[in-house]
Each structure stands twice: as structure tokens, then as C-alpha cells.
A protein has these predicted regions:
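Amphipathic alpha-helical polymerization modules
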Residues: 1-229
Length: 229
């Protein structure tokens, strides 16, 4: 296989990885609390094995931390965050962070997320008395009627994306300055129109690399036939 094929293959691989990331963003443009993912690549210069050629290397992806829009729905247990920070839920004994505030009260009167995981307050799971009106202040203080029952754990720090809209800490977490908004949800921060344009561009880039590889392969075949005469 020629060096040009390797160059084209590295470019096609990077283009396809970028296409998959953008496609995932488009698919989750309506997912509550979803943060868009951005791919990044590195241009690798000549080395012992590169033989003077320049390659593109996929270096993974990072998420866009900017806020989505906050949409009011007047459901008392639905919460959104304005600013940097994350809610904390108990994921089988470990902390899972999220911006998805589609919370509800389960049969044990615990505040839980859409997956049934207990939402954490500063003192652990948040239990809400039956039949009381729930009110949540901007600082995360939770009231049942006139009684303060808990304070939401809202944290911030270095995190990595897990699944659709979950995050896990990669370092020490601290208290967040985000404002809690009750009766509202945060939308995805994906710009669907811009993402669709990016998706088309990524598809064309991948196709261009494929065509370049095919052209190089055809040239190699012709040269081999010529050399064999």
C-alpha cells in the first residue's frame, strides 16, 4: 500500500470520527440537558515511519459546556441550572453528574432523576413529605410547605462526559455558583441547523478522502501494469 493511501486513510478516519460525533449531536438536539460534543484532531508531521508525509490523527472529543435554553414547564420537581454546575445523583454508590433536571418523586418519597436514581442533597438523598407543596430556591434550598427539608448538591469542576447527558468527575469537585430554576428544564445546547450543515460538510470531507484514496490506488495499479511490461 502506498504512502499516499496511508495519508488518505488517516484523513478518512478522522473525517468519519468527526461525522459520527456531529451525527450524535443532531440526534440529541432535543435531549434535555445534552451538551454538544466537539471532535479535535492533530496534524502529525514527518517521523521515522511517516516518511515525510503529514497525517491527521483523531485525538478524541470534548463537550461544549455552554448553557442551553431554559424552558418553563411549571412542573414543581423539574429543575434547571443557569450557569456552570451539575446536579448530583447516586448511580449505584458512585456519583453521576447531570444537567438533566427531569426529577420526580418515587414511591419512597425520594426525589429521583428520569432513570430512577436518587438526587443528592448536601446530606444525602432528598426525601419529600407526602402532600406538601415543593419549593426550591435559587440557591438549591428545598422546602416542603414552609419547612426546609434539604439543600440540593450542585457541584462544579473538571468532568468527562458519560453517555447522553451524564458526567463524572476527573478531579476535585467544589460547590457551584449556578442558579437553580424551578419548574423549568434546560434544553440541549446543540444548534440543530448549524449541526446539520456541519454534518453535510463532514460527509463531503469523508467522501473526498475516499476519492483521493481510490485515485491513488488506481494510479498504483497503472504504474504496476506499466512496470510489468
Amino acid at each position: 500500500m502506498s504512502r499516499e493511501i496511508y495519508v488518505g486513510l488517516s484523513g478518512a478516519s478522522a473525517a468519519w470520527a468527526n461525522y459520527e460525533i456531529i451525527a450524535n449531536n443532531v440526534a440529541n438536539a432535543s435531549t434535555t440537558g445534552f451538551k454538544a460534543t466537539r471532535s479535535f484532531h492533530e496534524v502529525v508531521g514527518p517521523s521515522e515511519h511517516a516518511l515525510g508525509k503529514v497525517y491527521a490523527m483523531n485525538r478524541g472529543a470534548s463537550f461544549d459546556p455552554t448553557d442551553g435554553s431554559i424552558v418553563t414547564d411549571n412542573v414543581s420537581t423539574h429543575l434547571a441550572l443557569r450557569g456552570s454546575g451539575f446536579f448530583v445523583v447516586d448511580d449505584g454508590g458512585s456519583q453521576l453528574l447531570t444537567r438533566d433536571g427531569r426529577f420526580s418523586v418515587n414511591a419512597q418519597n425520594l426525589l429521583v432523576d428520569a432513570g430512577g436514581r436518587p438526587v443528592q442533597g448536601d446530606g444525602g438523598p432528598i426525601e419529600l413529605p407526602q402532600g406538601e407543596v415543593v419549593r426550591v430556591g435559587p440557591d438549591g434550598t428545598v422546602f416542603a410547605g414552609d419547612q426546609e427539608v434539604a439543600r440540593l448538591s450542585v457541584v462544579d469542576g473538571a468532568v468527562e462526559q458519560v453517555g447522553l447527558n451524564g458526567f463524572r468527575a476527573t478531579g476535585t469537585l467544589g460547590s457551584a455558583s449556578a442558579e437553580v430554576v424551578q419548574g423549568a428544564l434546560e434544553t440541549s445546547n446543540v444548534n440543530a441547523v448549524a449541526a446539520m450543515v456541519e454534518l453535510v460538510q463532514a460527509s463531503r470531507m469523508f467522501e473526498a478522502h475516499q476519492k483521493a484514496m481510490q485515485a491513488s490506488d488506481d494510479l498504483d495499479a497503472r504504474l504496476n501494469r506499466f512496470g510489468g511490461r
